[in-house]
Swiss-Prot record:
It comes from Helicobacter pylori (strain G27). The gene is dcd. Pathway: Pyrimidine metabolism; dUMP biosynthesis; dUMP from dCTP (dUTP route): step 1/2. DCTP binds at residues 109-114, 154, 168, 178. Coiled coil: none annotated. Belongs to the dCTP deaminase family. It catalyses: dCTP + H2O + H(+) = dUTP + NH4(+). Keywords: Hydrolase, Nucleotide metabolism, Nucleotide-binding. The keyword Hydrolase applies. This is dCTP deaminase. Its EC number is 3.5.4.13.
Amino acid sequence: MGLKADSWIKKMSLEHGMISPFCEKQVGKNVISYGLSSYGYDIRVGSEFMLFDNKNALIDPKNFDPNNATKIDASKEGFFILPANAFALAHTIEYFKMPKDTLAICLGKSTYARCGIIVNVTPFEPEFEGYITIEISNTTNLPAKVYANEGIAQVVFLQGDEMCEQSYKDRGGKYQGQVGITLPKILK
């Protein structure tokens, strides 16, 4: 399995729509950086957030109650305040169409990590298509700003040594084609 370089990421995005919209260079002046890097792509977080609150006493991943989260639009302010020790969901500006022979791993940006903001995203499986739901945790005892439409995490692409027999699309992945923030689902 090989780590893919900027030239491959650029070609796959411009010729095959792997990342859209695609920024061919790293943008980083007066913003948290985003765009193409040497061996990855820095994704941006949109302006819509879902802040988890304590209206209900329990989070159940098998039976998630949407009332456990409050939708917040940060488009006007340009940022979202994540309360101390809080958790929120968001989504990428970029839409992904993963090749069948490629898996992507997403890692939080050091700018946020150094402020106690932890970003988690599960792997982008072969032939996954959709916007990416981003999990954001504030591990500090202080409120923190998360900037809308700026960098939030870096995606690295790993191409398999051989083609997988069954992709995410082939098995009807439950988050295939997701748009916006997608809450937990269980196939029934």
